[in-house]
Design a protein with these regions (language model features):
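A conserved mid-protein helix/loop that constitutes part of the nucleotide-sugar donor-binding site
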Residues: 22, 26, 187-201, 276
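Membrane-proximal helix-turn-helix segments that form the acceptor-binding/catalytic region
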Residues: 84-92, 116-136, 229-230
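Donor nucleotide-sugar binding/catalytic pocket of nucleotide-sugar-dependent glycosyltransferases
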Residues: 131-168
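Conserved donor-binding/catalytic core segment of Leloir-type glycosyltransferases
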Residues: 173-190, 196-199, 208-210
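Nucleotide-activated donor-binding/catalytic signature segment of Leloir-type glycosyltransferases, i.e.
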Residues: 223-251
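Acidic donor-binding loop of glycosyltransferase active sites
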Residues: 254-270, 283
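Conserved acidic donor-binding segment of nucleotide-sugar-dependent glycosyltransferases
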Residues: 299, 303-311, 319-325
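A charged, aromatic-enriched C-terminal amphipathic alpha-helix characteristic of glycosyltransferases
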Residues: 324-355
């Protein structure tokens, strides 16, 4: 698209610091190249939510929402209220566009780190039904099928999880010291507790975790205990936990080593921001053979999937570290994935579909 769309659009993004909000911030740059954008960011508080809906009721712009669906801990009631407001808003302004990143139906609540109430799936189903009058975009074929078949939502659009760039940076350095790297906010379902055993099986390979503990998790009854136990385990195993890094610092770290990404998830949501981000850096990824990663691999991503055991992960990682042919093949797959499914291409898809369904004529 070479000419900007003439109408101003309101882009409502989830808060930054989460994978969803960070994705939205990058999408904002793409949208601004094509549309006249008014940007609003959701603040994770009741006050912020009230402020958001005051803004929405006072403006008469077409809207694109970038939202996460699942919300746990103390934020669950606030998130449910937000979906009630979305329902009310859609009765006055139908077929607004929603980018929906995850779903209660594809979440394994047992490993979320939060109390697993029987009411949670019920509330999630009710919240999903509230979106029936929206034009929804998802990054998971599983979510697409659930929204269409289980909930009967008509306007659902699927696009594989977008890569940040159309080209791969190729940060993998065969001649440098090997490094296992995990990145993303820290929660029980990420399965990090098996990293020490994998590290040992690979001759105590240097291992680093980048990311903060998820804030709402730490406010739960078991959250502080989970954090303390994991920090102690990693410290005793010689695994560094470096906290959050912006993209520039993370890329610097990756380039210092022969970096291989490791994602030993116990369960996963619809798409892994971390996995696709690693693809854009051109570094190999080894992940648990979950549906979320299998879908990315089936779409062409250079990801090796294994059973979630230390032996299986260690064997795959050792194979990568000792085979330049394999790493080259994986990186070539990454290049093809990024070229087809970049955030640039998704933005074009989002606008084209939204214009035909929601925006009307320019």
């Amino acid at each position: 698209m070479t000419e900007k769309y003439k109408k101003e659009i309101l882009f409502v993004n989830s808060f930054r610091g989460s994978g969803i909000g960070d994705f939205g911030w990058k999408l904002k740059s793409e949208l601004e190249a094509r549309l006249q954008i008014k940007y609003v960011e959701i603040s994770p508080s009741w006050k912020g939510l009230v402020r958001l809906w005051k803004t929405l009721t006072r403006c008469n712009l077409q809207v694109i929402f970038n939202l996460g669906f699942t919300s746990f801990g103390k934020s669950i009631y606030r998130n449910f209220f937000n979906f009630m407001m979305l329902k009310l808003y859609s009765t006055v302004h139908p077929l607004q566009s929603v980018i929906l990143h995850d779903s209660i139906d594809t979440s394994n609540l047992e490993y979320s780190g939060y109390s697993n109430s029987r009411l949670l799936p019920v509330g999630g189903a009710i919240a999903t039904i509230m979106l029936k009058n929206y034009n929804i975009f998802v990054f998971s074929k599983i979510s697409y099928d659930i929204l269409k078949k289980k909930y009967g939502i008509k306007n659902v659009n699927y696009f594989p999880f977008p890569a940040e760039n159309e080209t791969v940076l190729e940060c993998y350095k065969q001649d440098k010291e090997p490094l296992l790297l995990n990145m993303g906010y820290i929660a029980p379902y990420k399965g990090l507790e098996i990293l020490p055993e994998i590290k040992t099986k690979l001759n105590n390979i240097k291992t680093i975790i980048v990311g903060n503990f998820y804030g709402s998790l730490l406010s739960t009854k078991n959250g502080p205990k989970f954090k303390q136990e994991l920090v102690t385990l990693m410290k005793d195993s010689g695994i560094k936990m470096l906290g959050y890094m912006d993209d520039a610092r993370l890329i610097e770290l990756v380039k210092e080593y022969r970096t291989v990404a490791i994602l030993p998830y116990v369960s996963g949501y619809n798409a892994s921001y971390s996995a696709i981000f690693f693809l854009t850096l051109g570094i190999p990824v080894v992940a648990t053979n979950l549906d979320t990663f299998l879908e990315s691999r089936n779409n062409g991503a250079g990801i090796i999937l294994v059973n979630r055991t230390p032996d299986a992960f260690a064997a795959a990682l050792d194979m990568i570290l000792n085979s330049s042919d394999l790493t080259r093949s994986l990186i070539e797959d990454d290049k093809k994935y990024c070229a087809h499914y970049s955030i640039h291409n998704f933005c074009d898809f989002l606008i084209d579909v939204s214009k035909s369904v929601t925006f009307g004529s320019p």
